[in-house]
């Protein structure tokens, strides 16, 4: 790759100029935040310059543009990633060290952008990285949340949500583009007019806001392509401040329009338990969809005029889950109401342009909206959805015996609700799942009626991760070792990692793999001491489960294992375990009481075990607050056991399993999601698999013969003891007992089969950890996992999307 700075001296000269211009001080007199701001502004300027060249090249080559719509983009810190992708990280680090600075400290000043929460948003970010690497003209389209989901704090063991003030010191990567703002209307009423035999529609009396875009450059590895992520912020139409109201003491009312508009883009996933929250969520979804569709059509028109029938040739619109489901009807609205196309012509364009990724298995978890809410807030869009639904229903031959049930399952409007997944499928030419088992379940269960009607639409695209961020950037010690062994071509093509299998018999190399892991464990231990005040031993096994908290992900099963090991150690002097640090991290949705109770239980157990001198030399429990990309990049490289223990058939794919595998952790998991493909690639002998399979789960549920009380009563000494401890005060010292968890397991009959899989899980854990003292074989399996993980690069996933869905 061609470097953007020809020498260290040239970089130093320009960097000093930026520092002086932005801080008014010499480098030696600045703080690390000053140094970060100057460096990020400098690199962002370089990136925007390459972005302009990328846009020009795309126009000249007539490239098809891919617009990736997602409610989340969890992009993480960008500075280190961009220095790596531009090929200048070593040069910059050396130059700053020569100036008396520390690049690592400078990079730590960067906030984690609160533009997403979990796997959905991180997947979208990895896809943007890979689109840029692959030279695809790819554009992210999302929301700019002022406060994100929330910043998680732990107070007396409980999750407490506080606003994430990530923008408080500015964000040097973004550029506001008020010239590209789009007017968005809510509410109002539909007005029709007749022209010949055609009816045309508009909406009057709307409550309008401005969607204002902020552009963030997405630098591809090699520095040849820089794409854009466009995030929309809601602002009032008129920046009107009511001075009379202010002088009369109505300080809130004086700026009410701004407050109401900005609320739309204030936080990710507003609590939708009440009508106000539901309206806010629906406004968010429409705002970023409508603004994005308007913008891409404007771009198309500048380059191709009003040749709308050519749109599918030059544009692909991809919807990441159902939050952008209104892409189809909004595109219909503009093509018909503003451009004068007939329904049939507009529909032909929509269904050849839009594609949809499903991330959900459970039918009850699919997004739905009350018709009353939807039709009031978005009357014209609802009219179009109603017509799409009517035409869909007309396609059924109701004389056929299966038609009634198929219509019920596939209709967009049903039982007073707008079903967004059905809307997404009907408006798309492609529907994909995100792991082989997930795609099979979609066709066999969740969306089986659509699959029966249109089997050619359905395909699988197993998720992937950015190996440059989550391996090269996150794990520099291991990455350096890999590069010494096989060269650096793996940065460009992760499939090259498979060459590492040649070193599985090299004792010296395996020892260095172990030394790299220990260095990463020390780094994480220092972070835990600094952030949590807890001392953890880097010579213990690091057993890691880090992900969003949800019942089906079964963090409860994990902490029950810890409770069991604790009890057995105290009760049986002959019982021995491999010394282990159990590491948890992740957020629970603010309204998800059960998940928050599991977090409280983990911290309650940690409070007891970490303060019990009888065990805390062999057991520690660590909950790392506020899981985000930056601390994930410390956790993944240090992990030795990757806990992927969802109830079989519930996890669509997962990506933490891939990140942990790539960093040399061994998977302890069920045959669910992408775990199945990990086992296929790395071999069952190099992982630890337990528990019921998806068919076994389905059969057990169908039998009606699962009774939680029977499971517990058959094992009073171990399971019975754990269940009792939830309510007998054993772990209540920090914040009380855990009656709701006890009730969920025993009186709601343990829906996620925690008790059923318990013994299989603990046995698998004991068997796996018993092999830990054989360092050479453990390191061999760790290296083998890394070697076989290249298939999970998001570069591979994006090539499949490009070739098989977008045809870009």
Regions found by a protein language model. Give the residues of each.
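A conserved ligand/cofactor-binding region detector
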Residues: 1-808
């Amino acid at each position: 790759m061609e470097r953007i700075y020809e020498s260290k001296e040239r970089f130093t000269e320009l960097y000093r100029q930026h520092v002086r211009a932005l801080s008014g001080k010499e480098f030696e007199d600045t703080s690390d935040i000053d140094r970060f701001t100057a460096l990020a502004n400098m690199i962002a300027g370089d990136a925007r310059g390459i972005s302009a060249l990328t846009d020009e090249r795309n126009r000249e080559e007539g490239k098809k543009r891919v617009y990736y719509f997602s409610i989340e983009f969890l992009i993480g810190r960008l500075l280190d990633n961009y220095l790596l992708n531009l090929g200048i990280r070593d040069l910059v680090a050396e130059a700053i060290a020569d100036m008396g600075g520390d690049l690592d400290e400078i990079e730590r000043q960067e906030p984690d952008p609160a533009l997403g929460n979990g796997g959905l948003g991180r997947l979208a970010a990895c896809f943007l990285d890979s689109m840029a690497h692959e030279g695809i003209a790819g554009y992210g389209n999302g929301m700019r949340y002022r406060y994100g989901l929330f910043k998680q704090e732990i107070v007396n063991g409980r999750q407490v949500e506080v606003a994430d003030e990530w923008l408080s010191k500015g964000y040097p990567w973004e550029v506001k583009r008020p010239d590209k703002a789009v007017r968005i209307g809510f509410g109002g009423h539909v007005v029709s007019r007749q022209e010949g035999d055609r009816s045309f529609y508009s909406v009057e009396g709307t409550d309008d806001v401005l969607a204002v875009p902020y552009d963030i450059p997405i630098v591809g590895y090699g520095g040849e392509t820089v794409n854009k992520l466009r995030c929309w912020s809601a602002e009032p139409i008129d920046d009107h401040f009511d001075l009379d109201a202010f002088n009369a003491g109505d300080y809130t009312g004086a700026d009410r329009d701004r407050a109401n508009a900005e609320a739309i883009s204030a936080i990710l996933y507003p609590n939708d338990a009440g009508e106000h929250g539901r309206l806010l969520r629906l406004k968010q979804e429409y705002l970023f969809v409508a603004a994005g569709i308007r913008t891409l059509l404007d771009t198309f028109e500048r380059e191709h005029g009003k040749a709308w029938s050519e749109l599918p040739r030059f544009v692909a619109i991809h919807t990441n889950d159902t939050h952008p489901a209104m892409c189809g009807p909004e595109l219909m609205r503009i093509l018909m109401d503003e451009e004068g196309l007939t329904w049939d012509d507009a529909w032909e364009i929509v269904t050849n342009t839009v594609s949809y990724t499903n991330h959900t298995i459970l039918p009850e978890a699919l997004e739905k909206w009350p018709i009353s809410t939807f039709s009031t807030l978005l009357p014209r869009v609802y009219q179009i959805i109603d017509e799409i639904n009517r035409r869909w229903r007309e396609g059924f031959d109701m004389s056929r015996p299966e038609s009634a049930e198929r219509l019920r399952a596939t209709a967009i409007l049903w039982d007073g609700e707008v079903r967004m997944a059905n809307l997404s499928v009907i408006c798309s030419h492609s529907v994909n799942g995100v792991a082989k088992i997930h795609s099979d379940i979609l066709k066999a269960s969740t969306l089986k009626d659509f699959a029966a009607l249109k089997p050619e639409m359905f395909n699988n695209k197993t998720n992937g991760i950015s190996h440059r961020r989550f391996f090269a950037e996150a794990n520099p010690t291991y990455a350096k070792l890999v590069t010494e062994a096989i060269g650096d071509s793996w940065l460009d093509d992760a499939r090259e990692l498979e060459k590492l299998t040649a070193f599985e018999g090299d004792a010296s190399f395996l020892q260095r793999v172990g030394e790299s892991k220990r260095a990463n464990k020390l780094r994480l231990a220092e972070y835990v001491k600094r952030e949590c005040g807890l001392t953890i031993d880097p010579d213990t096994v690091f057993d890691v489960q880090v992900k969003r908290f949800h019942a089906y992900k079964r963090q409860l099963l994990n902490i029950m294992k810890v409770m069991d090991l604790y009890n057995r150690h105290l009760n049986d002097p002959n019982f021995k375990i491999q010394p282990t640090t159990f590491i948890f991290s992740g957020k629970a949705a603010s309204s998800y009481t059960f998940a928050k109770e599991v977090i409280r239980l983990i911290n309650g157990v940690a409070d007891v075990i970490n303060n019990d001198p009888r065990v805390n030399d062999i057991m520690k429990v660590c909950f790392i607050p506020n899981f985000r990309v930056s601390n994930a990049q410390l956790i993944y490289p240090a992990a030795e056991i990757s806990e992927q223990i969802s109830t079989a058939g519930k996890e669509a794919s997962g990506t933490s399993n891939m990140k942990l595998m790539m960093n040399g952790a061994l998977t302890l998991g069920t045959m669910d999601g992408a775990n199945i493909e990990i086992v296929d690639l790395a071999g069952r002998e190099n992982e630890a698999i337990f528990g019921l399979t998806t068919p076994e789960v389905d059969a057990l549920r169908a039998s009606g013969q699962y009774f939680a009380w029977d499971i517990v009563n058959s094992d009073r000494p171990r399971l019975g003891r754990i269940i009792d401890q939830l309510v007998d005060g054993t772990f209540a010292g920090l914040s009380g007992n855990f009656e709701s968890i006890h009730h969920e397991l025993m009186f709601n009959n343990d829906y996620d089969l925690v008790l059923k899989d318990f013994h299989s899980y603990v046995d698998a854990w004991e068997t796996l950890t018993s092999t830990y003292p054989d360092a050479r074989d453990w390191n061999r399996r760790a290296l083998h996992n890394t070697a076989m993980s290249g298939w999970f690069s998001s570069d591979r996933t994006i090539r499949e999307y490009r070739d098989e869905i977008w045809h870009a």
